[in-house]
Amino acid sequence: MIALFAAALFVAGGTARACDTALLLAVDVSNSVDEAEYRLQIDGMADALLDPEIVLALTEGRVTLSVMQWSGVERQVMSLPWRQMLTKADVIRFSQDARALERAFVLSDTAPAEAIRFALRQFDEVEDCARHIIDVSGDGTPNSGSDTRGASQEAERAGVTINGIAIESMGVAISGFYRRALVTRDGFVITARGHRDYPRAIRIKILREVSRVVG
């Protein structure tokens, strides 16, 4: 979740180009997410990237994307490394690769603080970008790991924005936790009413994030 940077950027293929935004999409694959819900998240993300408005904003803004999966304390992995979206073909290829991702972890806890800290380290590869954003999706509150608010404050000190998609389920108030402890002060939360609402929510969120790049 980030916008505006103009500098030499890491791109697939090793070429340095100007980039406005580095956006890291962090997908929750903890124990509360079953296989069908995982597919809803992955397919929803892949579909959202192909939305014509989002394709235009990504390419005009020279946005650089990556995808990570996260769950417990030592359960984070970069599933798709940083790639810059210079053309529609770049976006289509990234969407296809995202849709093909296999789930990285199963039967694991929920540790968003450790996910945030892992994500922060990834921005070393795109440090010249003007704005850095972590886009966290999840359907649960922490049951392992360190204090989430502390990790969010570390992101603020590093100049990184955290936005969130809170996937609500019956009797679990995820949106309030995200607003209180996870997103940064310049960030925002989009609520998905269950995993089936996730495709709508992620489209809105990505469009809001990358549209800031092109006005």
Pin down the residues of each PLM region.
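Sec-exported extracytoplasmic/periplasmic mature domains
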Residues: 43-54, 103, 120-128, 142, ...
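Sec/Tat signal peptide C-region and signal peptidase I cleavage site
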Residues: 14-18
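VWA/integrin I-like adhesion module and closely mimicked acidic/polar interface patches used
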Residues: 140-180
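Short beta-strand-loop
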Residues: 63-98, 174-180
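Second-shell loop/turn segments in exported
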Residues: 26-36, 65, 81, 99-109, ...
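Von Willebrand factor
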Residues: 19-81, 85, 92-137, 163-174, 197, ...
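Von Willebrand factor A/integrin I-like adhesion domains
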Residues: 170-214
